[in-house]
């Protein structure tokens, strides 16, 4: 997969990982998730004009990171450089009120379904992680309940992560829109690849923004990237004409 990502970047394609994971002010935690990729950037001594095409959008749409030109580490892009006007209009008190209400719903659902959970609250998200194994449908029930009952003044995303349920400020659709504006990509030039397109998944909202590809595992992602690279190479010697 690392080779596929680098080959895309060398073909002038921007590659961004849009993830629910959010670590405000802690770029090193994002780096730990991508140690192999960043180390390969360093080992191959990739020039900045290549690594500038790699980004991470964390917390659905709350944190944008880029690769530093020399050390090939991750750094946060200042909010003023990439946030959309709508994002800049969100008030902190409204965000915290949404998270508090979401936490109350998560508590209520956990008690109703009689499951023991650990709560996690961050700057822009709140969630539960079951302490003991539970069935998928229980998490599905909680995610759908939050989606339908939570009312807030800011956009939010309540989703079943498979082993947990989280509510984030914003959603991946907003993250993609901000990412596209930042890189200058148009909707017809953008493809979002994900595996959580069900009603309780956090990829679903992206269908309103660009083309999507629903995959089941990383192997499928790799297969389609190889197809894309093959088409890109073909187009260089055989231009597409309608």
Model-derived segments and spans:
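Active-site phosphate-binding/coordination module
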Residues: 3-115
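A short acidic, often aromatic-flanked loop/helix-cap motif at beta-alpha or helix-coil junctions
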Residues: 56, 62-66, 126, 163-167, ...
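Short, charged/polar "capping" segments at the starts of alpha-helices
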Residues: 24-27, 136, 221-223
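A generic structural motif
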Residues: 10-14, 154-156, 188, 209-210
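Short beta-strand/turn micro-motifs composed of small residues
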Residues: 19, 58, 130, 194, ...
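Conserved acidic, metal-coordinating active-site core of Asp-based
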Residues: 101-191
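Mg2+-dependent phosphoryl-transfer enzymes with acidic/Ser/Thr/Gly-rich catalytic loops
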Residues: 166-168, 173-242
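Short, glycine/serine-rich, charged loops/turns that create anion-binding
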Residues: 22, 61, 130-133, 197
């Amino acid at each position: 997969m690392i080779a596929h990502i680098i080959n895309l970047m060398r073909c002038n394609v921007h590659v961004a990982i849009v993830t629910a994971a959010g670590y405000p002010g802690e770029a090193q935690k994002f780096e730990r998730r991508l140690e192999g990729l960043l180390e390969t950037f360093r080992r191959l001594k990739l020039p900045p004009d290549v690594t500038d095409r790699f980004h991470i959008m964390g917390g659905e749409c709350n944190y944008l990171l880029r690769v530093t030109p020399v050390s090939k580490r991750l750094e946060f892009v200042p909010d003023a450089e990439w946030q959309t006007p709508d994002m800049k209009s969100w008030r902190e008190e409204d965000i915290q009120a949404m998270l508090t209400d979401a936490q109350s719903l998560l508590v209520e659902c956990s008690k109703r379904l009689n499951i023991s959970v650990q709560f996690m609250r961050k700057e822009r998200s709140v969630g539960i992680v079951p302490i003991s194994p539970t069935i998928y449908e229980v998490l599905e029930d909680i995610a759908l309940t939050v989606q339908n009952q939570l009312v807030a003044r800011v956009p939010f995303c309540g989703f079943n992560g498979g082993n947990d349920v989280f509510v984030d400020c914003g959603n991946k659709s907003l993250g993609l829109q901000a990412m596209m504006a930042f890189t200058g990509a148009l909707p017809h030039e953008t493809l979002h690849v994900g595996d959580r397109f069900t009603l309780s998944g956090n990829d679903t909202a992206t269908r309103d923004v660009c083309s999507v590809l629903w995959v089941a595992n990383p192997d499928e992602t790799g297969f389609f990237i190889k197809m894309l690279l093959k088409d890109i190479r073909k187009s260089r010697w055989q231009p597409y004409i309608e």
